């Protein structure tokens, strides 16, 4: 099984994807914009090939994203927080590449993974998957406080036979954990950041732009990296994906019993607070009370 399998084509600004499973093989998740031009005729172009290239900000939280070759790719300014990045097996010496980034030259950020776990299905060989290769020479990818499974190659990154990437691309890592968390053997043109430098990749800084956007509205709770299971999968994946029929049944029961049956505006405000609290309890969340209730 091979070839391009795009599950999500995302090209826009202030995009938020929360608690989703995005699955494919090659080129699973595209984060626009496209590069200005194809490298060669017949290359990837997409439906917005004639549109102006505008770098959008995109936020992925508590998601599972899986594939084999270049399965997270594009030129967006993207922040992945508390996600599982899962590599699939294709039975080759080089089993895959996680990212293929095309950050436009001069952009301050590309892809940032914070508190994510890089895992693999059974059968994926140790030391067989690159963290990334540059779709364009100035690709930017940073890993902060992430867990790396043994399938990740010791050298970390490949230049895709693009020598110019050695001086333009920015690949960086800090506070990495797991079997492949040691960056000693990373390629010399990748950066090993200290804790102070890693602070420059905070979500509210990476995604701020000109309008100060922060999809979480301020400092977030700690991600689940510290509570990883033996295989590196974050706790939220189990919470959101296991026993789905039982979860649906419980949500249906809660929905029937929580219907608003009073009359006054004060009753309605109290009902909203109580309902949100009940939903937090069902889903095991502690963050829903952070955002104010708004009429949309």
Task: Please give the residue ranges for each predicted region.
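A broad, low-specificity signal for short, low-complexity segments enriched in glycine/proline
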Residues: 43-46, 103-108, 229, 273, ...
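Non-catalytic accessory segments flanking enzyme active sites
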Residues: 245-296
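Extended hydrophobic/Leu-rich segments
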Residues: 196, 223-226, 235-237, 272-275, ...
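Mature N-terminal, pre-catalytic/accessory segment of carbohydrate-active enzymes
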Residues: 221-258
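Sequence-level preference for short, compositionally simple segments enriched
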Residues: 1-222
